[in-house]
A protein has these predicted regions:
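Acidic/polar, glycine-enriched structural segments that form the non-catalytic walls/loops
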Residues: 1-73
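Well-ordered alpha-helical scaffold segments within catalytic/enzyme domains
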Residues: 27-32, 48-53, 83-94, 154-169
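Residue-level recognition of alpha-helical structural elements
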Residues: 35, 39, 168-173
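Aromatic- and histidine-enriched alpha-helix N-cap/loop-to-helix transition segments
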Residues: 41, 75-82, 92, 147-154, ...
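Helix-terminus loop motifs that line ligand-binding clefts
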Residues: 54-69, 95-158, 163, 170-174
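Segments forming glycine/polar-rich beta-alpha architectures that bind adenosine-containing cofactors
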Residues: 67-76, 81-82, 86-87
Length: 179
């Protein structure tokens, strides 16, 4: 049968809801340039790509390195999210930024296990992370992965930026400080 979680709306209702979502998203995220249509098109394509790959309110997923544009990296999350993508979400949709940071915070125990396995104290977020938080770096890249020690710093930097830009001190106190 049809899962109960599917909406009971008509096609027109779903289309209307979809259009309203995108109208709001573009109001919050659009950037307009003058003088070069190719630059404007490229900019909007990138903004659209960032908006469509987010999963609002779901802190059990992050954003893969290739988004929805390919199979590269098997859908795994990298530090690129915290450094390169999170600033967009902070400006356009802070709740999504919070969900992305919660993804990391909820995987703190896995990061602690990685650090302990390497003889270190604290937490070491993996270079290539699956939804479990475990290091899923392919064997061919394992040696490089061990040298990629900046990921925890990227996570801390992103948490600090989130708190500073949103003023959400409760989130920082409850999750950020420990992470």
């Amino acid at each position: 049968g049809v899962p109960e979680t599917l909406p009971t709306q008509t096609g027109e209702g779903l289309l209307s809801e979809h259009a309203a979502f995108w109208e709001n998203a573009w109001q919050n995220a659009d950037v307009e340039t003058e003088g070069d249509d190719e630059v404007q098109t490229g900019l909007r394509w990138n903004l659209f790509s960032l908006m469509q790959v987010a999963c609002p309110g779901n802190s059990d997923v992050s954003i893969s390195a290739t988004g929805l544009h390919g199979q590269g990296y098997f859908g795994h999350a990298f530090w690129d999210t915290e450094i390169f993508m999170l600033p967009f979400y902070l400006a356009a949709c802070p709740e999504e930024a919070k969900s992305l940071l919660l993804y990391r915070c909820k995987r703190l125990d896995a990061a602690r296990k990685i650090a302990a396995a390497e003889g270190c104290e604290g937490a070491k977020f993996p270079w290539t992370s699956a939804y479990t938080g475990n290091d899923v770096t392919p064997p061919d890249w394992a040696a490089s992965s061990k040298r990629e020690i900046h990921i925890s710093g990227a996570v801390a930097y992103a948490l600090h930026n989130y708190a500073g830009q949103t003023g959400d001190r409760g989130f920082y106190k409850d999750y950020g400080i420990e992470t």
